[in-house]
Amino acid sequence: MQHKTIMDKIIIQGARENNLKNIFLEIPKNQFVVFTGLSGSGKSTLAFDTLYAEGQRRYLESLSSYARQFLDKVGKPNVDKIEGLTPAIAIDQKTTSKNPRSTVGTITEIYDYLRLLFARVGEQFCPTCLEPISSMSASDIISQICHLEENSKIIILAPIIKDKKGSFNDKLESLRLKGYVRAFVDGVMVRLDEEIHLHKTKKHTIEAVVDRVVINSENASRIASAVEKALKESYGELEVEILQDNAPSIRKHYSEHKACFKCKMSFEELEPLSFSFNSPKGACESCLGLGTKFSLDISKILDPNTPLNQGAIKVIFGYNRSYYAQMFEGFCTYNGIDSALCFNELNKEQQDALLYGNGTEISFHFKNSPLKRPWKGIIQIAYDMFKEQKDLSDYMSEKTCSSCNGHRLKASSLSVQVAGLKMADFLTKPIEEVYHFFNDPTHFNYLNEQEKKIAEPILKEILERVFFLYDVGLGYLTLGRDARTISGGESQRIRIASQIGSGLTGVLYVLDEPSIGLHEKDTLKLINTLRNLQKKGNTLIVVEHDKETIKHADFVVDIGPKAGRHGGEVVFSGSVKDLLQNNHSTALYLNGTKKIERPKFEPPKEKHFLEIKNVNINNIKNLSVQIPLKQLVCITGVSGSGKSSLILQTLLPTAQTLLNHAKKNQSLNGVEIVGLEYLDKVIYLDQAPIGKTPRSNPATYTGVMDEIRILFAEQKEAKILGYSTSRFSFNVKGGRCEKCQGDGDIKIEMHFLPDVLVQCDSCKGAKYNPQTLEIKVKGKSIADVLNMSVEEAYEFFAKFPKIAVKLKTLIDVGLGYITLGQNATTLSGGEAQRIKLAKELSKKDTGKTLYILDEPTTGLHFEDVNHLLQVLHSLVALGNSMLVIEHNLDIIKNADYIIDMGPDGGDKGGKVIASGTPLEVAQNCEKTQSYTGKFLALELK
């Protein structure tokens, strides 16, 4: 009986990793389990750093001795015992790939099956004339020639050389020895027994005359013999010249290979590599399969509205005495151009000469020496200036490849069709449309029985994988979408879909907030997908704050009661029904006892708007929208409706560029913004890491580390030893541990496995050498200080205002639990975003800032959301404007104004379908067909 209990449960005994307080917990297997609790309470520590880490360690133990030699260095989680643990797979929010060749299709392997489908049953078309491509047998060719007009005079030719450079004496001699009398050389018939001289540096075409014959029934066998001889001589190809009286002759091309007889082009047999943009067989030769090319961007080299002599040409000005600046002055003098004019004020001829050169020699002085040089134009000058450094990044832009139009493949591959659609069609359609296409078997009725048999298993695999993507709410994405551009939440749901497709059973899946980035409309679809994964015989542990996900769980574990040192305990474990009867923080929000309510602030007396006009990007077409200033405005809508396109890809870069150039109410790239005079800066607080190395941490990012180093350097012992502030930096030699160079960890290369970070055995993770650690403030070394939580450090430095004020802002945004020296790479996206928000709070406020945040509630418990809402409204109360892209209804219902995009994602989105106060959007939801409004109406009841 005891054995059965262990097998049915995962039993954790004595978990003490990070802030966990000797946890004992039993988790039922093969169920949907949710871990919840405040940010920093220890949920992720228990789920990822304990359960998943131990599962991985046990997996490594099962490997060969070569892999096991590293196990002493790979730390075991601080836990006494875990029983009943099954193989573990973690699906977190990290972006899937940084490789520009990775797409949604390649990650999910759907593209591999599409390549196979196109290679096996694809119909080839000529990319030039769009005619079908076919191959012919020798008997087919003979039959077609014999059926030419009766008594036609024809010449049967064997192509030997096609448009190649060389003298080809050996080829001509070989034809003579084989008994050929005549040949066509560059379109002219010559006798092979005469001397033929070909220029070896020019391209030539040589065709052997196999026979000259008249079309009639008597010559049928002769024609057949000549055709077979020609095909053998030219490896499956031949030409027929039909002679006509009083008219030019007609040429016909025949081939045993796949060919377009109209364009006289041969094509290789299709194989999966023909559709791989990572292979020379399929990749576009211009962009090498990337779909984009980098080229010089004139707008980055030249400011058309700045006088030429005042730095308009960014690539050469700033170096007033430089070689190119002097040459430019000579160019202006020679061409009679007034350098006080702007580029836009020059005529077309002058503009072209300036940009592209005009070949004229320019006289100028450089270092007191007269020089004469041809003016190449500033674009060529830019290339010349940076040829050695090979760094043109500041002056270049990534643009769609004009050869393949961004589709990455060769023209011959892009012209192949399956069911009337090309590969590019499948890669650019929303996944929802691709799913419906493959779900309709009538599209493939045109295939013959053999082709259907080949296609059937491939179509089944494609349909399954596409359905799983559609089922997790990713129907708006495309298979060709660059993997680098998808969010952490999207990336996680892609991997969930891939796992369902893998069909694994008996696995422990650990997921980190899979509902991130999902509209309420799609949350139930995600829950059903997770259920499908669980029903295959797997255990799901989901770290989550979403109400719906928690309510649909089989078992809930609530970690708390607070964050950091005040957390690390299991405050509840059991069913949702029992949870709702509890009286701790999570239960109070779920059963409605406690609610998130907006703070009371006076609304602005003056109403100003920021108006964006003529937005055309992705699925947004010719959109204009007004955004109220000095308010908390939420941009809402289902995934893929155009929120990020409108705000992050249009408003943000356009407003920043115009404000940086002090240009109010002007347009950029066709987009016009009205109302910028009410702002002095636009700040985007994203979820990108605050640093990419172990030496980046909250203390260094917020600037509090500088004040701490000053304080340590002011200690009496430090002054006696002559230690400056740099002694207490782990970024430079002197005070840091040189074995790990101030990282605290050392990277171990695992070769066939991911690299592992292990604690430095010299400094034991302290980052500093022993001499530096001897300097103490109130009995604590600088390493001790970095190991403190923000909350502990705030109490410790209470009498040091310069330090305390910066720490207070971190507490204000709900980050009192993180440690000052926490490695930046271990912080979640939500934590990184709030650290950036804290840094902004510590700066002097102008009251004219537009803050843009993308899903700031990521990783936040209800209590933390309440806290964040107070901070956002406090910034608005100072006169600033807050623009938040958000799905969380607790933030949306407490906003001043909502702009809802939709009605759906992808091609069905891109419009503003509702706007107004939360109450107005909710009341008009039936009329506007706003999903946000419908859920808001339920929330506001």
Swiss-Prot record:
**One Pfam family hit:** UvrA_DNA-bind
Q: Does the keyword Transferase apply?
A: no
Instruction: Spell out the InterPro entries in the cross-references.
Output: ABC_transporter-like_ATP-bd, ABC_transporter-like_CS, ATP_grasp_subdomain_1, P-loop_NTPase, UvrA, UvrA_DNA-bd, UvrA_inter
What are its GO biological-process terms?
nucleotide-excision repair; SOS response
What ranges of residues constitute the C4-type zinc fingers? 260-287, 737-763
UniProt KW keywords: ATP-binding, Cytoplasm, DNA damage, DNA excision, DNA repair, DNA-binding, Excision nuclease, Metal-binding, Nucleotide-binding, Repeat, SOS response, Zinc, Zinc-finger
Q: Give any GO molecular function from the UniProt entry.
A: excinuclease ABC activity
Query: One GO term of the cellular component aspect?
Result: cytoplasm
Cell compartment(s), UniProt: Cytoplasm
Annotated ABC transporter domain residues: 316-585, 605-937
Q: Where are the transmembrane segments?
A: none
* Entry binding sites for ATP: 37-44, 637-644
Q: Which domain of life is it from?
A: Bacteria
Q: Into which family does the record put it?
A: Belongs to the ABC transporter superfamily. UvrA family.
What this chain does, per the entry, is described as: The UvrABC repair system catalyzes the recognition and processing of DNA lesions. UvrA is an ATPase and a DNA-binding protein. A damage recognition complex composed of 2 UvrA and 2 UvrB subunits scans DNA for abnormalities. When the presence of a lesion has been verified by UvrB, the UvrA molecules dissociate.
Q: Which PANTHER family match?
A: UVRABC SYSTEM PROTEIN A (PTHR43152:SF3)
Subunit text? Forms a heterotetramer with UvrB during the search for lesions.
* Name of the featured protein: UvrABC system protein A
Taxonomically, what lineage is the organism? Bacteria, Pseudomonadati, Campylobacterota, Epsilonproteobacteria, Campylobacterales
Gene name?
uvrA
